């Protein structure tokens, strides 16, 4: 944002988005009983119904810092819910002084609401009030003259759009940075006792699995609460993770094997030996694992249900070291070459066979990333000045042709938005993530993260 634009916003009383988000509103409702009637709190239960007729939503523009420079300012909207919620609180059973009867006492209570429930990129993104819930309902017995009280928490609805996060594994300070993809700012930093070296997000965006390559551990982050909820033991040096399209299983490459994790129980249920493999990829249907075998110079195909090697491409590759499959399609890209430069070959997954080679040779590739619709692939070479400046190659997968070659300085890993409009590039030497617009591959914002981000996922 230009300085004069920023000044105009500040003159219009635009403040920074610093009000804390809260979707919870606790309440306490005292209950008075008619003379001669009582309730036994040991057996009593409470019920609550509510009306949101007097509740409203407003969008308040505010400012966020989008980059390291003072003029790197953007506008977001604080979504504020305000007004009143009318509660009908009931307690039962209510009995007379002789212990007879099975009635109930109800009280109408009005709860004031005035709080920011989330920040949005656009105005008018109000929540659905029908999704309001009540949690932690509790009956508090009378105490020193105070009446019986029903306490609980109103939980206000989340954003109508699913929250989208970008995660970076920061090897320099053993943290994971969580970036709000709407705000393009870090909203949480999660510390670990072991170094995070790679990570992956389930397709339903519910969980992030963090690999600790210096140990034999995989940590699980709940993406709703952004907290670590479990640690799973696998083989030593876990280096890559992929998920089947149903999110039923996660596959972790470690110690010369694939460790199959049941995501419901978050436990290892099978181990598939993959001797000689330097890399692996799961087919789009989640039925087969394909490995780049640096020992036998082959691409091997394993059935994930039986763990058996079922097919191989042999005697056609020279030291295959990287393999990547798209989200949809019957092909994969294989980086191969014992020395430098190296080539990329397209293979057919079924039947397993070698296809054509890309005409361009590469120093090496750090990663190959596909767009969600699988129409684009992004080949990332190491960045080196002044010899290797244009280090990103954009591929039209239908034509197997490079359609762009641009510069992403210092990029070590990539994540592509589902609509293909932006690329998030992890830059470990700068402790930052740069967001590039794919229409012209210009940087639109720089996001400071933890030290040494070496892997990124969204």
Curated annotation (Swiss-Prot):
InterPro entries linked: Host-pathogen_enzymatic-act (IPR051200), N2O_reductase_N (IPR011045), WD40/YVTN_repeat-like_dom_sf (IPR015943)
SUPFAM superfamilies: Nitrous oxide reductase, N-terminal domain
Gene3D superfamilies reported for this sequence: YVTN repeat-like/Quinoprotein amine dehydrogenase
Superkingdom to which the source organism belongs: Bacteria
Protein name, entry field: Uncharacterized protein YwhL
Native species: Bacillus subtilis (strain 168)
Lineage of producing organism: Bacteria, Bacillati, Bacillota, Bacilli, Bacillales
């Amino acid at each position: 944002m230009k300085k004069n634009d920023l000044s105009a916003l500040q003159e219009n009383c635009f403040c920074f988005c610093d009000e804390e988000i809260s979707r919870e509103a606790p309440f306490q409702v005292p209950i008075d009983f008619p003379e001669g009637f009582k309730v036994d709190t040991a057996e009593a239960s409470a019920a609550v119904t509510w009306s949101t007729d007097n509740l409203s939503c407003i969008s308040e523009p505010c400012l966020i810092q989008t980059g390291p420079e003072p003029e790197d300012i953007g506008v977001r909207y604080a979504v504020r819910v305000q007004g009143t919620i009318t509660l009908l609180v009931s307690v039962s059973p209510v009995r007379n002084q002789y212990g007879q009867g099975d009635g109930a006492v109800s009280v109408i209570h009005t709860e004031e609401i005035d709080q920011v429930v989330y920040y949005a990129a656009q105005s008018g993104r109000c929540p659905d009030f029908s999704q309001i819930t009540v949690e932690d309902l509790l009956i508090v017995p009378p105490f020193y003259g105070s009446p019986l009280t029903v306490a609980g928490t109103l939980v206000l609805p989340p954003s109508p759009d699913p929250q989208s996060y970008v995660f970076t594994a920061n090897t320099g300070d053993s943290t994971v940075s969580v970036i709000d993809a709407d705000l393009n700012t870090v909203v949480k930093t999660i510390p670990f006792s072991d170094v995070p070296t790679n990570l992956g997000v389930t397709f339903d965006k519910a969980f992030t699995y963090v690999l600790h390559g210096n140990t034999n551990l995989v940590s699980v982050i709940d993406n709703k609460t952004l907290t670590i909820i479990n640690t799973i033991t696998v083989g030593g040096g876990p280096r890559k993770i992929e998920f089947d399209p149903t999110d039923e299983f996660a596959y972790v490459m470690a110690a010369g094997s694939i460790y199959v994790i049941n995501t419901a129980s978050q436990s290892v249920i099978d181990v598939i030996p993959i001797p000689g493999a330097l890399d692996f990829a799961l087919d789009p249907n989640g039925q087969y694992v394909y490995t780049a075998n640096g020992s036998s110079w082959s691409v091997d195909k394993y059935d994930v249900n039986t763990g058996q090697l079922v097919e191989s491409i042999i005697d056609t590759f020279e030291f295959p070291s990287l393999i990547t499959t798209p989200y949809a399609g019957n092909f994969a890209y294989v980086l191969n070459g014992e020395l430098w430069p190296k080539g990329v070959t397209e293979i057919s997954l079924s039947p397993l066979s070698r296809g054509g080679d890309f005409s361009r040779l590469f120093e090496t590739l750090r990663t190959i990333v596909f767009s969600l619709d699988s129409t684009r692939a992004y080949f990332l070479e190491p960045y080196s000045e002044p010899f290797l400046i244009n280090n990103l190659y954009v591929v039209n997968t239908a034509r197997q042709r490079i359609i762009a070659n641009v510069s992403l300085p210092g990029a070590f890993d990539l994540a592509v938005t589902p609509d293909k409009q932006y690329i998030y590039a992890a830059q470990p030497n700068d402790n930052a993530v740069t967001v590039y617009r794919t229409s012209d591959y210009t940087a639109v914002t720089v996001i400071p993260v933890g030290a040494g981000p070496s892997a990124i996922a969204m």
